[in-house]
């Protein structure tokens, strides 16, 4: 018999089947056995099929096989155990528990395994008390028991004790990537990022060494989806690769390194989108380069899957992304449609914060009142915790001091977003003085926080008469990253340059721009593209245009954008250009501005450049809620119109 390239010779069928199983070719075995007809329904056939379905991660099919085996051989306890195990892996917890309870304590050799499986089911069902009760009945000191004890401690937020249990499990049972991942996760929760990354690195290195067939990193080597999918073999599940790289991505994402987070996800074994596990799909949604709409679609899909497939963080993240991208109506609709998830997955704090942001769209006064109440509550808690830190510091009890500082830092993490939300309500109405008041009010707790200082600098900068004060906030950020100035936001560098210029510190501005230019050239030699200098020149040029110095201002803007490939010309940068050009044209139409012939020539040449390189580049930015026209205006078309207007106003009819 020839079956899809597999030769099944008479008398050698069993040997061939077992060789295929040895080579982990479970799908081939399934196809071979199911083609045998009635033989597939024998005890031997069902047993082999159940084993292969389970290891091919087709758990519902495996459960069906073991259910039939339980009927064929009702006295075989192992079949009932495998049946329950398959149901558990398929997420059918209630039926799995029912099967285990029917087994009772009849089989001593399976007692420990049954208790372990029961506690796993209760843990997955979030019945932690029940899981703990069963754990107390199990043999102590084994690697499995120590790991499960660590999981329950982790769930109870006792992360230090959890780390100790997980490490003990590694010592007793040897290296296990899934237990090592648990250690990494506990370190991550303790904000010990370096230790967490050490464990994830070891898991990935061992995975690459032991499982080259998984193609780890292949997506980085063969970009644009060219790498061949490896599917979801059981080796991927037990290698811990998926968990480790997702955790690495989460660490980078929390640190603000979104590109590094995407790279970590690209290191995952290549799979089609339909083959991705829920956690990977969730993290890809958060880092989606196509923008928030594409990410929201992925998260909405996960939300529809429901528990246990949908990661519990999905609900909060879909709401946060909506608010971050000003999709407040969408956020309100999601909250209204999923009231059950609101109580289950949102803390009282997060619900109140999101509710305030949504309320601000219809009543800024009511939103401010809600945020004020929340801020007052958290400020009171911070003062109490600060006093506790001082008390404990006097006792010289180091562990108590660490715990007190941790509590204070956690409360501060909650307070800061509330401060930013209150300042944002004033900011969006261009009430920068009101926003500054919020920063003054919160300085008692937040003045050393880098995010707070950055936004305080922005608020001062926008007032237009506090450039010295703004520079005082921006300068420490730039100094802190003097070894890698490209890691500083281009907006900060641009605002600092403007602050220097507006306070007559032109030499400092020029020096900063030289540093940026030099750093950008060095990074460019390494194959990395940065637009920091472009943005700085754009902002500085816009500033001079606003002061009616169009000759110098437009020369800065042209210098910022004119590059061989035109890759700096896109909707965001074009917005600066056309605002300045329109300002120039308005002044010329009113006969308030007269430009030298040479300057007009330079501006016309620059607009020709924009026309040429922007012929197919969209000229406008559309939000996620706006309807994009079928034939949107391009930069090239707008540049041509502006060039014709400039020709008319300059009376140069020969151009």
UniProtKB/Swiss-Prot annotation:
Question: SMART domains given for it?
Answer: TPR
Q: Which PROSITE patterns match?
A: TPR, TPR_REGION
Please give a single GO biological process term from the UniProt record.
intraciliary transport
Provide any one GO MF term from the record: intraciliary transport particle B binding
The listed locations are: Cell projection, Cilium
Q: Which residues form a coiled coil?
A: none
User: What is the recorded name of this protein?
Assistant: Tetratricopeptide repeat protein 30 homolog
The primary gene name is Ttc30
